[in-house]
Design a protein with these regions (language model features):
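Internal alpha-helical transmembrane segments of multi-pass membrane proteins, especially GPCRs
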Residues: 13, 17, 23, 129-139, ...
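Predominantly long cytosolic amphipathic alpha-helical stalk/bundle segments
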Residues: 49-144, 155-167, 194-230
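Hydrophobic alpha-helical transmembrane segments of polytopic membrane proteins
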Residues: 178-192
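Hydrophobic alpha-helical transmembrane segments and adjacent short intramembrane/lumenal linkers
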Residues: 164-178
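Alpha-helical transmembrane segments
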Residues: 27-47, 146, 153, 188-203
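Hydrophobic membrane-targeting segments
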Residues: 1-56
Length: 230
C-alpha cells in the first residue's frame, strides 16, 4: 500500500484554502514579530549603553553648561538617546527661565521639571515601541491556530461521509494538516510572549533609572537656583 509522505510542506500544500490562509497569517505575524524583536532588542541595548555612558559623564564633574553645549554639535545631535534627551530638555528650560529674569525659584523648578516629565514620557514611549504588537501576537496567535485546526478537523470528518470504511489512515492526513495550524500558532506566540516579557521588564527598568536621574538632576538645579537667590 502506497502512503503519501506526511511532510510539513505536503501537509500545508494539501490543507484547505481557509487553513492555508490561517497558516499564511500566522507565518507573516511570526516574521513581523521577529523583525520587531530584533529592532527592539537593538534599541533597548543602545539606550542602556547610552544611559551608562551619559551617567558616567554627568557624574564626572563636567560643567553642566559645557555638557549641554556638547550636544549642540551636528555630530553629537544625531547620537543623543534616552537620558541625555531628558537632561537637555530640563537644562534648556532651566536656562531659558533664568535668562528671562525669573526670580521665583519655585517657578523655575516647576517649569524645568515639567519639561523633563514631557521628555521622560517620550523616552518611555520609545522604549515600549512595538510591544503592544508583540503582546497581540502572543495572545491571539494560539487562538487563530486553534481556529484553523478546528476547521481542518471538521473538513476531515466531513470527508468521511464519502468513505465506506473509516480507518486511521483515512483520517490521519486531514487531522495532521489541521494540527499544523496549531503548531504554527504556538511558533508565532511563544517567541512573542518571551520577547514581550523581557522587553517590558527592560523598559520598566530603564524608565525607573530615567526617573531617578530626573530627580537627582532636579535636586542639583534646585540647589543652584536657591544658591543664586541667596
Amino acid at each position: 500500500m502506497n502512503q503519501e509522505p506526511l511532510s510539513i510542506l505536503h501537509l500545508i500544500a494539501n490543507a484547505s484554502l481557509l487553513v492555508q490562509a490561517v497558516m499564511l497569517l500566522l507565518f507573516l505575524a511570526s516574521m513581523v514579530s521577529w523583525v520587531m524583536i530584533v529592532q527592539r532588542g537593538l534599541y533597548q541595548s543602545k539606550a542602556r549603553s547610552a544611559y551608562n555612558a551619559f551617567e558616567s559623564l554627568f557624574w564626572s564633574g563636567t560643567d553642566l553648561t559645557q555638557l549641554y553645549r556638547q550636544g549642540n554639535t551636528e555630530a553629537n545631535r544625531n547620537t543623543i538617546e534616552g537620558v541625555e534627551n531628558i537632561f537637555r530638555a530640563g537644562f534648556k528650560e532651566y536656562t531659558r527661565l533664568r535668562q528671562q529674569g525669573s526670580t521665583d525659584p519655585d517657578a523655575i523648578m516647576e517649569g524645568t521639571q515639567r519639561a523633563m516629565r514631557v521628555a521622560l514620557t517620550r523616552e518611555e514611549e520609545k522604549l515600549e515601541g512595538n510591544l503592544s504588537f508583540l503582546a497581540s501576537v502572543a495572545s491571539v496567535s494560539p487562538y487563530i491556530g486553534l481556529f484553523g485546526t478546528v476547521w481542518g478537523i471538521m473538513n476531515s470528518f466531513r470527508g468521511l461521509a464519502n468513505v465506506h470504511q473509516a480507518t486511521l489512515a483515512t483520517v490521519a492526513p486531514g487531522i495532521s494538516e489541521a494540527l499544523v495550524a496549531t503548531a504554527m500558532g504556538l511558533f508565532a506566540a511563544i517567541p512573542a510572549v518571551l520577547a514581550y516579557n523581557r522587553f517590558s521588564a527592560n523598559a520598566e527598568s530603564l524608565t525607573t533609572r530615567y526617573e531617578t536621574f530626573s530627580e537627582e538632576f532636579s535636586a542639583i538645579l534646585h540647589r543652584q537656583v536657591h544658591a543664586k537667590q541667596s
